[in-house]
Every structure is written in structure tokens, then in C-alpha cells.
């Protein structure tokens, strides 16, 4: 046998390689319809090919002339291997940096059954509460946790990060202030990233930030509010009572940014007079993740309930009178109040809030207190030992963090010793370092720290000696101080029942089974892009090389992350046609805000700070005007024509009228009505001719990738919802990521950061930080990296084409039953379509909600209801749904239309019918005498597929008005559920 002879002929080898590549290709796994399905769907639409469909859908003037320049697509396994090599370049050090970020232990039962479970992470925001009771209960637990720990009356269902929560608290304080002040006091003991985000948020609103010492602030100057850190960033615990009393006497509200774990030992903010409490629940089992995602919290007094940002879960009742949960007080949210909204927050951090709540459920009040006491005792030990070694500890009272004055010791020597042992400390200055103890710290870690801080000629000591020192310093223990907590917390049974893994596992499964996620069926929400979140994309999120990195770790330890960011930024720049990308905004709402701030800073830098008018089409999503107002801009509405397109004549008139003051136009493309507007380039040119900039909302980017690019169309800024187009899961309402792309002239103004240099070119003119962490929720960026790496240019482009195909297929199949409200000039839609149900109210007294709830009986989540047009539903199938699933969904809507027809002709009672009584629970079918004029079978099994697998709504239709009139946002007593 000749060893170097080819085993296969070259052509045979090529064929085998091609077959192997086809088998391992990710794109066909991601895209639902196969080639045969695509041809059948095209036949229904009357097109010979996908390209022919796209040619008639997307204006030729904006089409890409050449394919995207991206790396060749890799298989799932090859991409994971490539990312693993990048991850290996990160160095996982033991970080004692603190500053709001701490290592923690994620209970494995929570990691496996929530974080890694698509039943939890693929769900959408619970706007259809009857099929989201599990998530809503977990979030109610979260709110109860926060209410109990902070000692305040109400809490929301999470915010993006602690710094953003503090900024939202400032906005609330400003909104309710009656003393006409425009100054806000910020303690210099707050975390630096919080101070910077507050300064960023304050500037466009004309708020003057006063950073100072709360102990010496004399209140001669009027302030509308203040924020204090508890414990302080350097670990000190202050008695804030006197300051708060003085602030209240001057009509100011006081916010306390508090570590929730410390509140198991410390007097809660609500008990010493705080009006608002904010903070991060990261140390409740959420990995560091180089900055996120983590769930922040926001608690306040009930009198401010209609001003609270984000979402609040409230208790109501269903049609059978049983307790049921829903999102409460929705009329205060940005999608309804628009420019009058007090916040633009939309997506928050639901998945992480669920994890944090279950961490508290699993450990219970005693377990949480034990964790906190262990941390505190180790910190006391550390302080005693360092004092024994001759160091000064700055604080008399502390929880987990020490500021260590080095005295004559060299900082450089200390840091060299730390480097040798893979340890990070916080560096205050040349004379002091910070050490924060956390849940993972052990006695062995303390020995290592003592060895680092011991002088070469000093003698180390045993733990008995440290114990003696601690015994002599018992007064420093929080339990023996005036700061000790005396009130009970987490007394509800949910926090005292599920402490074994068996019990928690079953509880998690019970909640998960109440929720409809992508594991059940398609979620056809328009403008939400509920596409596949592939397992290969999700796996790297849990790798320690990404999860155990502190956001303020030295750059030398984060080379893997830097490569990831550079590659992802380059890919997104190519996809969008922009010169620069910022990955910092940690939600779409924050991307909008950051993009508009960049435009504002650009005008200001050119001496045109007077430009403050933002033109926004009347069809825009509510976050657009809310974001514009937050940036200090005046919103001027631009009319839309009868086809839902921007009225170009009205745009020209408004641009002309406000030419001197014009700052920007906010435009969504394709439009919020699901159409590629033909004159988009003319629209951009009009704005530019009057000195304005064009901000493109990237919510509908799933219809652009590989076909056209915002930068080529004429946009100057565009935010990208990575949790839509680029496969980060919605998590039931977060996490999300909203990076922005900008044209070259705007690159210098991209967000900066006070702790970490993120772009040298922007440090002098940047807008400041818009999120607490330098790269936002950095650890989930691996998901989008994996998606692009596995799809490649061809796969991404094909996905866009199929998304457009799927939407048009649905529109075509349903147009005979429900009018398609808006279409392009060739009778086609983009990636979503609006079905008009308004006539049904007159013909059959059927409301939009009746159809939405009836879809649950068919096993589907409703499309987006009554937006962007009241009385309509907007359907976005995405490219991931198969033809079979699309057909099932269409069949469900057709069957519902036939049910409505029976009402219209008088065959069925107009009030007692399958729609008005939907959704039907299993309990409603078997309890008591059946008194409806239709059968149980019609109610529960209206379609063949429901017999194969039936998803049961957990509750009947919920009484929304009752819940708002009787506002309760914490756990009900257990007897309420049995009554």
C-alpha cells in the first residue's frame, strides 16, 4: 500500500466535502421553510423565485449592489470552537473590585432550569397574561423580595442596571418636585458609573448635578432630589437620617442606591425615610458577565405608582373570580403616553429578575441572611488581620467592602503580588485600595490576601489570633450596631417552602408550564421578531471565560472580549453601512436614547445647540417620542397618508418651518406599518438639506440585512435590537441589547465610560455613559456573534428574504378573511403585515381582545394588538417558522373568522360565544354545570392539532380594570389562591 496515494479522487472528495458542508450548515437549521416549501409559497404569491419577490418588495434604489463582506459561514461546532479560542484569551482572576459587581454562586438548579431553559428565555413580555402566569408569578416574587428588603411599598419588575435605575429615580424626583429647583445632589460616595450616567441623563434636561459630601452639604441651594449609596462605594455605612430629614424639609425626594444583600442585615432605606430605593440584584446568583445582563430594581412609595418606570406586575382576578396576575397600570407606559411618558424603558431584565427571585426563593430569608453574615464575618476578619499588619481601615462600620490605606507600603508592590496570584483589587489612588468580599470568598482567600499585604519581614498569624482581634472589636459587627435590621422580611410562604432542589425543580416546572414560549408555538408579534434562539448561540453565555470577568478588570485580562467586540462591531458596521458602532446601550430604548444624544452632541459641538426639534411620524413606536423628550428635544409630529406612509409634503413643510431648529428625524424602516416606503432617500435628503440628522429606528432591521443598509439609505444613526434581528432571546421581557451604528462624522460622540477607556477617539467629545457597564450586557453579545458567524453573508441574506416571504405568504392566505391594511406599491408587505379587524366590532360586537384570547384556545400567542393602528393585529412570522406552522396559524385565524361569521348571521349568541368567553381553561370545562350554547369540544379543541398537543391557559380572561382599581404588586396570602 502506498501511503501517500489519494484515497479518493479529487472530484469525489469535493462532492463529499460539499455534502458534509450542507449537513453541517447552520442556515437551513435556522430558516424554517425548506426549498420545496419556499417554492410552494412563492407559487401562492405568483413569483418564480425569491429574488423576484424581493425585487418587487424592496425599492431598487436602495438595494445592495454587492454581497455583504463577512467571513464564510461556519458550522455550529466550528463556530463554537472558534469562539472557544477567543474565550481562552480572557483571564479569569479573583476580583475583589466590587463597585456594584460581585462574584456569586448560581445554584445549578436555577442555571439549568431557567438560564439554560428555552421555556423561560424564549417567551415574550407578558402582555397576554393568561398564557404568562408562570413568569408573572416569578416577577411578583421579585417585586415582593424588593419591597421586603427595601422597606418600601411598591416595586417594579426590574430595570436595566443600577445606574439607569438611579437616573430613572432622578427623573421621577424631578417630575414630582414642587420647589421649582433644577439641581440634584449626588453623593460622591456613589459608584462612579452611577454618577456618570446621572450626569449624562441630566445634561439634556437642564438638570444641574451637584456631586458632593452629604455630611457637609448645607442645603443653602435648592435641590429637587438626592441620591445616596448604601453602603457607600468605599464600603462605609452612613447614618443618612439627618440628611434625609433636611432634604424633605426643603421639598426634595431622596433616593438610596442599596445593595439588596446587605439589607438582610442593615436597616432598610424605607425605615430611615428614603422615598426611592434602587440597586442591582446581580449578587443574587447572576454571573458577573463582564457587566451584564443583571436585573436592577426600583422601589418607592405607592403615591408614585403611576410614575414608576418599566413594568409592574399586579394582582387581579379572572372571569371565574380567581386571583390572576397581569401587567398593571399599563397606561403610564411609553408606548401609550409617548412624548408625555416619564421614561422610555421598554425591555428590562425579566430573565435575570426571575433568576434573582428564585435565588431568594431557594435560599429563603434565613439562607440569604446566612450568606450575608458569612460575607460580613469574613470582612471583619479581613479588617482585623489587615489592622494587625499595620494598615488603616477607613470605615468604622462596613458590610463587605474595605478601603485600605496603604501608608508607607508601595501600591506597585501590592499590585505585583496580586498579579502573581491572579487577584484584582480596586485602586482608589496611589495610597489606597479597595477589597470587596463576596459569596464565593473563603478563609483560604483571606490567607492569600494577608500574604499579599504582609511586609517581607513581618510575621503572619493564625486565625485564632484574628478571632481574638475580632472578639475585641465586636462593636464593629453590624449586628451590634445602630444599623442592624430589626424588621422581618420574606415571610411569605413562597420564600419558606422550596428549599430542597426537588421542591424548587417542581416549582420552576410548574411555573414554566403556565407560559407559552417558542417551545410551544410561533409567537407572531409584529415589530418583535420572535425568531429562533439556537442552542449553539446560547451555550457560550454560560462559559466561565465570559461569565466570571469583572467589568472593570484590567484590559490585559479581557483580550478575548476585546477580540469579540472588535469582530462584532466590524460585522455590524458592514451589515449597516456605518463607520462606527457602540455596544454600550443595553436595550433598544437605550440605543434610541444614545443615538439621539450623539446627534445632540454633534450639533452642540458645531455651535448649533439651538437645534432641538425632532420630527417623528405619527406612526412611530412610543419609545421614539419618549426618547426624544429625554434628550431635551421638542417633538413635532409628521403626518402619514392613507397608506400609512410618511406624508412627504407634510415632512417638507415641517422641515422648512423648523429649519433653524431642526435636530433630527426619527424614522423606522421598513415603516412601523410593515412597508418599504419608496421615497425613503428623498425623506433623508429633505432632513439633511435643513441641517438635521436622520435617526433610523432599527426595530425592523430583520427586513434589511443583506438587502439594503441604513447607512446607504441616508441614515446618520441607527440602533439595532440584537434581541430581535440578531437572536438574543427576549427572555420574557429582557435582556436585550441596543447598540448603535453611526456615520463617520458622529463617531467622536459615541458613549464613553468613567472607569474603562472604551474608545480613545471619543474621550474628549463623547456623550458620557448611557449604561453602568462599558459594553452593556457584554456576556450576551456572544449570542449575536455566534449567529452571524454561523449564518455568513449568504445565510443572513437568505434569512431576510424568507422573513419577507413568510409575511407575504400569511398576508396572501388571510386577505380574503381580514383586509391587509397597508401594502407597498406592488401590493406586497415587508417582514410583517397588519390585518384590519375594526369592522368586526360593528358586524359582530367582537373586540380585538376577543380574537387575541381565542387564539390561545388554538395554542397561539396573539400578534401585536391595536398597534400601530387601533383595532388591528400586526403579524411578524420571522424566517424561523416553517410553512407548516404558518399554515396552522393561518388556519386558526380563518377558523376564528368563521366563528365570527356565525355571530354575524345570528346563528350564535353575540355575548355567550367561544370568543367572548375565551380563553377556556381546563378547570372551566369540568367545574360545575356547562351552561354555554356551544360544546366543551368547541371551546377547548377547535382545531385538529390541539388534540395532538394542547396548551392550556392557566387562568380565564383577566379583569384588567379591577387590577388597576385594586392595585397590589406583592405576593398575595396563600389563602387567596385557595378561595
Curated annotation (Swiss-Prot):
Q: Which organism is it from?
A: Nostoc punctiforme (strain ATCC 29133 / PCC 73102)
Q: Does the keyword Oxidoreductase apply?
A: yes
Cofactor requirement: pyridoxal 5'-phosphate
The EC number on file is 1.4.4.2
Q: Which reaction does it catalyse?
A: N(6)-[(R)-lipoyl]-L-lysyl-[glycine-cleavage complex H protein] + glycine + H(+) = N(6)-[(R)-S(8)-aminomethyldihydrolipoyl]-L-lysyl-[glycine-cleavage complex H protein] + CO2
Q: Which HAMAP family match?
A: GcvP
Q: What is this protein called?
A: Glycine dehydrogenase (decarboxylating)
Q: Name one Pfam family in it.
A: GDC-P
Tell me the domain of life: Bacteria
Instruction: Give the quaternary structure.
Output: The glycine cleavage system is composed of four proteins: P, T, L and H.
The similarity annotation says:
Belongs to the GcvP family.
Please name the CDD domains in this protein's record.
GDC-P (cd00613)
Keywords per UniProt = Oxidoreductase, Pyridoxal phosphate
Encoding gene per record: gcvP
